[in-house]
Amino acid sequence: MSLWPPFRCRWKLAPRYSRRASPQQPQQDFEALLAECLRNGCLFEDTSFPATLSSIGSGSLLQKLPPRLQWKRPPELHSNPQFYFAKAKRLDLCQGIVGDCWFLAALQALALHQDILSRVVPLNQSFTEKYAGIFRFWFWHYGNWVPVVIDDRLPVNEAGQLVFVSSTYKNLFWGALLEKAYAKLSGSYEDLQSGQVSEALVDFTGGVTMTINLAEAHGNLWDILIEATYNRTLIGCQTHSGEKILENGLVEGHAYTLTGIRKVTCKHRPEYLVKLRNPWGKVEWKGDWSDSSSKWELLSPKEKILLLRKDNDGEFWMTLQDFKTHFVLLVICKLTPGLLSQEAAQKWTYTMREGRWEKRSTAGGQRQLLQDTFWKNPQFLLSVWRPEEGRRSLRPCSVLVSLLQKPRHRCRKRKPLLAIGFYLYRMNKYHDDQRRLPPEFFQRNTPLSQPDRFLKEKEVSQELCLEPGTYLIVPCILEAHQKSEFVLRVFSRKHIFYEIGSNSGVVFSKEIEDQNERQDEFFTKFFEKHPEINAVQLQNLLNQMTWSSLGSRQPFFSLEACQGILALLDLNASGTMSIQEFRDLWKQLKLSQKVFHKQDRGSGYLNWEQLHAAMREAGIMLSDDVCQLMLIRYGGPRLQMDFVSFIHLMLRVENMEDVFQNLTQDGKGIYLQKPEWMMMALYS
């Protein structure tokens, strides 16, 4: 049975990278343009998205621009410009004058997952090595990954400050350049004004999105959030409509990023908290569990120190109940649909077909028009079954159908979206797939599924539970005789999918690769037996894992190492670790594995130079002396550090960094009472 409530979902899945040009931007060969600029010793200027007001747009955004707007490259704005660096993995982006909080909330969610971010933002780009003023980004665009090439000229005011997206690190520019690339894809900066978080999340990932109306949310919302935060998801949310800042600190009609969740214990009862961030980088919630709330005194000293950061950075905690009260939509995006099904041990497959509604031929409108034109809509046959049981099985199959309409103009906001939906019929008899079903079929048969209402959205989708068999899908526009193109996709465990009367023939479903699926299933089963694990059980769990990038030199986690790891992550001083705490740990372990593997030369150890490089790679700056001391403390007699010791060091440094940042008032020092100091020094 699916964990997720039957709310309207939006589904996406990305095929392999493509070099196709999109309607919004021309085919530009990044490598050829870069080579030409380097050969000629010049900086790239993108004539298809010039540094002029035409790229800003022609609407209300022009009225917000500062006087004497200029376009400058990052090396003109800072003496040491950086494209990206790992230390900035904390939320550092701030919204500019464009009303694109929906885009920035999605971007902040993307920034929390460096492996996903690196697909959209190639992180090896810089302002030094092979710099020619040209940058490239990738977006999932209506079924394909497309590259978007831009120059690095950015709009600034007279003081040289960025007027659109900026970073709290003044020399960091990946966010501003990504916004420019997305504006180019959309038509202009003006075309980024207003939108849905789900739209940007999908364009960044090609992943699976589900939108939950919080007013209708079921009682298992916390379970959904736990599973979502563990499964490499991107999560955004939106407040109720309006345009003002409320007395409680929330902004009406605004998008936020959900950056974390935490179950804490207050006076022997649990409290469920969610952590959110305002894309403005300021203006925070003022209620219970806000930065100045007295509720924090109910926690253990260690838990308070590691969770509470008194800083007007736009990030704050609030209870799950307050979240449901003050927010209207929760948007969860994952790379594969496996998150939404409990059909264990089976891979997902998908099929994607493109089609079009043509005036006076295939644009038949909704079913109420069935007497005249409904039957003229495109018709698709779908056969589904459970692969492990064959086609004679009667057990239901999880199926997801997604209908996505393509833009009707190169500028995102120039032509509004049409109201779209789809109908699903059960086919009880064999049908010749070369002949369109006649009007009589639709007069005699009632749809198994139909739209509650037609939505003017980029995509409409539905999760279905179908008996094995053959079905008919009819995508349509609310009104007949409107021209548009669409993408129709189906996700299931096994299916065949094709268009009636099409020359393209039968399309068999393709497997979706999810390398984490088996691992996730293993963890879930382990914690079903042991809801809270101690150091011995943690040791058992970690030593059962295969560390793929470490090759034949698989690490061994000693009991002492696991006791040290547990002490670092045990915020409520219970001596055990919950599945939520383990999931946080596992994310950090996977990142540490990548960093270690990159610097290791096949010996299974890091020397001083490699350790220094690994720490820099992770965004941690240690002096030479401290780095040497870390080798003495965590390395062996030969001053070499193995993987397990490296993990312990990384976790400890992250822990100490969080303590300092949460407690410091001036960025230079902190104040701790003696009990707090003893707790942090001895049990961490």
Curated annotation (Swiss-Prot):
Segments for region (Domain IV): 518-683
Domain annotation Calpain catalytic: ranges: 43-336
Tagged with keyword Cell membrane: no
Class of enzymatic activity (EC top level): hydrolase
Record flagged with keyword Protease: yes
Chain spans, region Domain III: 337-503
GO CC, any one term: cytoplasm
Similarity comment: Belongs to the peptidase C2 family.
Protein name: Calpain-14
EC number: 3.4.22.-
Active-site positions on this chain: 101, 254, 278
Binding site residues for Ca(2+): 570, 572, 574, 576, 581
Biological source species: Homo sapiens
Domain EF-hand: 557-592, 586-621, 651-684
An annotated GO BP: proteolysis
Pfam families for this protein: Calpain_III, Peptidase_C2
Region ranges (Linker): 504-517
Gene Ontology molecular functions: calcium ion binding; calcium-dependent cysteine-type endopeptidase activity
